[in-house]
């Protein structure tokens, strides 16, 4: 049997992390079994579905490289198929027309609730033989079995059973002729030959209804697996107050897709004590029986740790392709300065996100207007003039501009003046970067370049002279 899974988001908003994890699990299960992964857009909610949301879902899937083998299919383009199946069910007696008014249904609901009963349709039209005009408004309901139960073996939660007496005669076509969500899902899974439905636990109550419709259609019933929800680190349902929720917001915040995928796969699934997984390892090891039934807690610090790991573990050239977007957001002109791959090597240990990296690299490419006030006050003092003049001259004398030779020039300055490296290094750092923090000074000065470094040292010397004149 060829394994076929699907991810079927409703385009009413962005791709959130819960949806992304569901998509990842479905994708991994298909890839693990050499099967196929289908993308289906469930856009039957015409009022809330938007083209922008569809684009956001696609962007998120593409950024995570969760490529699909079929689709995207759109439910709104399949209404003729759904209605043909409903008409067939009406002929076979597995569905019926319901003419009950909203007023009657509301009165029925209130009566049942007053008695402490679960509100459900009483089946009046199911057994009615009244004649109605062809143009009289009606809905179509599924004639749910009235006896027995629905049992399915959830691949994560184990056997789950629902009594058919608890289930309503579901509306499958509205008065305007449009099919309903639960029905469209059934026909889609049937037509697309979906073998395994992996989705959120909020769909558990839909499953027995969908199974009954599939059986009425004499269609194969897929295997179901319902993934637990994701909570914030405070135990409450994940929301915007816990930080980013949209997948693309994590891109904007400077996370690599590999970090988010690695984090999401471990958010409810485990393989021994292993924390770091390549995409190939995820595919190799993923199984549904290793997915936890319990809700997971989203921990941003853990994601940040993973992101820092991947910034340094992945090839710098690859990381640079993602960094480029953030550089553009900061409007930094990188034509005069180190290659971005070299920048990743320089700043990788210091920066936990690509956004942080982009925001802290400008001095490598562009001159700064002024020195950081605190750093200048502390390190650009008259006592720093001589170390800066000596190190400037030694840097100017370098013919082979390497980080090693830059280091020798700084060390030689400290030796010549008989001072500690800090007496040379800190004024030099503020002079060439404008701030009090940077990567190792030799590689920083080397990356900034000989001409620009000397110009900035002269600017720092002018700054010191101006301060002296003002005193």
Curated annotation (Swiss-Prot):
* Cofactor(s) this protein cannot do without: Zn(2+)
User: Record's InterPro entries?
Assistant: aa-tRNA-synth_I_cd-bd, aa-tRNA-synth_I_codon-bd_sub2, aa-tRNA-synth_I_CS, aa_tRNA-synth_I_cd-bd_sf, Glu-tRNA-ligase_bac/mito, Glu/Gln-tRNA-synth, Glu/Gln-tRNA-synth_Ib_cat-dom, GluQ/Sye
MF terms from GO for this chain are:
ATP binding; glutamate-tRNA ligase activity; tRNA binding; zinc ion binding
Q: Where in the cell is it found?
A: Cytoplasm
Q: How is the cofactor bound?
A: Binds 1 zinc ion per subunit.
Catalyzed reactions: tRNA(Glu) + L-glutamate + ATP = L-glutamyl-tRNA(Glu) + AMP + diphosphate
- Listed binding positions for ATP are 240
Q: What is the effect of changing residue 100 to Y?
A: Does not prevent zinc binding. Reduces only 2-fold the binding affinity for tRNA(Glu), but reduces more than 10-fold the affinity for glutamate in the presence of tRNA(Glu)
Q: Which GO terms describe its cellular component?
A: cytosol
Q: What is its EC number?
A: 6.1.1.17
Short sequence motif 'HIGH' region: positions: 9-19
Q: Which domain of life is it from?
A: Bacteria
Please name the GO terms of the biological process aspect recorded for this protein, alphabetically. glutamyl-tRNA aminoacylation
- Activity regulation as described: Inhibited by 1,10-phenanthroline. Phosphorylation of Ser-239 by HipA inhibits aminoacylation of tRNA(Glu).
Give the location of motif 'KMSKS' region in residue numbers: 237-241
The residues listed in the UniProt record as binding Zn(2+), with positions renumbered to this chain, are 98, 100, 125, 127
Q: Does the keyword Phosphoprotein apply?
A: yes
Q: Do you know which Pfam families this protein is assigned to? A: Anticodon_2 (PF19269), tRNA-synt_1c (PF00749)
Query: What result is annotated for mutating residue 125 to S?
Result: Loss of activity. Strong decrease in zinc content
- What more is known? This is the smallest aminoacyl-tRNA synthetase of E.coli; it does not bind glutamate in the absence of cognate tRNA, which is therefore required for activation of the amino acid substrate.
Q: How does it assemble?
A: Monomer.
HAMAP family attached to this UniProt entry: Glu_tRNA_synth_type1
Full protein name: Glutamate--tRNA ligase
Q: Which organism is it from?
A: Escherichia coli (strain K12)
